[in-house]
Amino acid sequence: MTKSLPGVADLRLGANHPRMWTRRVQGTVVNVGVKVLPWIPTPAKRILSAGRSVIIDGNTLDPTLQLMLSTSRIFGVDGLAVDDDIVASRAHMRAICEAMPGPQIHVDVTDLSIPGPAGEIPARHYRPSGGGATPLLVFYHGGGWTLGDLDTHDALCRLTCRDADIQVLSIDYRLAPEHPAPAAVEDAYAAFVWAHEHASDEFGALPGRVAVGGDSAGGNLSAVVCQLARDKARYEGGPTPVLQWLLYPRTDFTAQTRSMGLFGNGFLLTKRDIDWFHTQYLRDSDVDPADPRLSPLLAESLSGLAPALIAVAGFDPLRDEGESYAKALRAAGTAVDLRYLGSLTHGFLNLFQLGGGSAAGTNELISALRAHLSRV
């Protein structure tokens, strides 16, 4: 007779345990789990996931992600927002990223501050160890405009710098709810303009070869920066990015898509997370959800924008609006390279150290970024 582990049922959300103790157990599970996962053979991952593949909408979920998600749910971890608590949610995301296994990726790293519309903006610059002039990517981290920082995306920026052979400038823009919309947009645009002006003299990067990119909320900010830069260049003059690298971006705050219904629970980013992020970002803000500064898909014109390299994940509630943005850009005459990672979930780029599909997908997107920037 098969027995379940003693006490597992009691660890589910809703059990009568002190909240802090439950969070501590969840944190331990995350730390241990992510270190063990890369060493488990794929057939064993299937067995540990009850021997069943998850197939939705014609896509089969990556076995590594399937095991991670199923194990997390057993211990009450589902989604990024923790008990509607900003501090706990930020700590949760930071803990996941810090727990990732593997050696540190060695590139030259410098912390700095750059001028912004409301004061200095913390930033981190990454340079390939070989030196030499390269393109520069201005990177905006994900986290629902509410979570995340320079450290949560440090490993991804290091990997991008090394494997794309480019310089990366990661921007620690202001977060909600302390700084509601459009604070993040203002910081993101100011950072791009500053980076473009100082790419050569400050970093030794190739002048005029500055791209923008980011994951999730950072992809949203990248798309918005491209539109703002285009409009400024048309009417006032100013720099524009040479490429936009949009990684499972949020593009329409008003959307109620099919993928939102299919993947709104159980696939890392939940519908509840999305709603909570929107509440934080728009709290005390007078910006309408349909404003292009929030919803770049709803901009009056999508012509004249930088070429786009867009990634969508098959098990992501944001999948459909990412595809819709790619389609709309193409219809407006913008060059688009759309990469569909069917077996993956939202957030897989922060999980590349787990191996499996997350590593393969991340490598594909960084290789594509390198190829695109070599041609602009």
Curated annotation (Swiss-Prot):
Location of the protein in the cell: Cytoplasm
Catalytic activity of the protein:
a carboxylic ester + H2O = an alcohol + a carboxylate + H(+); an acetyl ester + H2O = an aliphatic alcohol + acetate + H(+); a butanoate ester + H2O = an aliphatic alcohol + butanoate + H(+); an octanoate ester + H2O = an aliphatic alcohol + octanoate + H(+)
> InterPro entries in the record, alphabetically?
AB_hydrolase_3 (IPR013094), AB_hydrolase_fold (IPR029058), GDXG_lipolytic_enzyme (IPR050300)
Question: What are this entry's molecular-function GO terms?
Answer: acetylesterase activity; carboxylesterase activity; short-chain carboxylesterase activity
Protein activity control: Completely inhibited by tetrahydrolipstatin (THL), RHC-80267 and N-bromosuccinimide.
Coiled coil: which residue ranges? none
EC main group: hydrolase
Q: Tell me which GO cellular component terms the UniProt record holds.
A: cytoplasm; plasma membrane
Regarding pH, the record states: Optimum pH is 8.0. Stable between pH 6.0-9.0 (with pNP-butyrate as substrate).
According to its UniProt record, what is one Pfam family this protein matches? Abhydrolase_3
Q: What is the effect of changing residue 320 to A?
A: No change in activity
**Catalytic residues (positions):** 216, 316, 346
Q: Which UniProt keywords apply?
A: Cytoplasm, Hydrolase
What EC number(s) does this enzyme carry? Answer: 3.1.1.-
Query: Where is the major localization of this protein?
Result: cytoplasm
Q: What induces it?
A: Expressed in macrophages after 6 hours of infection. In vitro, expressed only in acidic stress conditions.
Q: Which domain of life is it from?
A: Bacteria
Q: How does activity depend on temperature?
A: Optimum temperature is 45 degrees Celsius (with pNP-butyrate as substrate).
State the similarity comment: Belongs to the 'GDXG' lipolytic enzyme family.
Role according to the record: Non specific carboxylic ester hydrolase. Hydrolyzes various pNP-esters, with a preference for short carbon chain substrates. Can also hydrolyze tributyrin to di- and monobutyrin and 4-hydroxyphenylacetate to hydroquinone.
Name recorded for this polypeptide: Carboxylic ester hydrolase LipN
Organism listed in the record: Mycobacterium tuberculosis (strain ATCC 25618 / H37Rv)
Q: Which gene encodes it?
A: lipN
